[in-house]
Amino acid sequence: MKKEIENREDLYLLVSKFYVKLLKDDNIKHFFDDMVKENTLEDHLQILVDFWDNILFYTGAYRRNAMRPHLLLNQTKPLQKEHFKIWLNHFNNTLDENFTGQLVHAAKTRAQSIAMVMELKVNQL
C-alpha cells in the first residue's frame, strides 16, 4: 500500500528501491560499479537520505557539494543526456510505486531540476 513520505525511514526506502532499479539497468549501472566493488553503496544511500531529507523537510542534514562527485565521475565515465533521462525515469517510477501525496510531486519537481542542472554542468566541461 502506498503511503506519504513522512520521515527518514521513508526516504531510505525510496533511495534503496531506486538504487535496485539503477543497478539492474544495463544502460546506467556502470556508474555505480566502484560503490559496489568498494562496498560503499550503503554509505552512499545514507548520504542520499540526508540529501532528500534536506530537500523535502528542510532539515539541514545535507551539507555537502552535490555537484562535485558527479563532476568527478563525469571525468572517467561521461554522463550523457540519456543517462539523466534514465535516472529520472527510475526515480519517478520508484516514487509512484511506493508513495503518494504532495511530497511525491515535490520530489519529482526537484529531481527534474537537479537532473537539468547536473546535465548542464557536466556538459560545460
Task: Give the location of each predicted region.
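Core of compact, soluble alpha-helical bundle domains
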Residues: 1-125
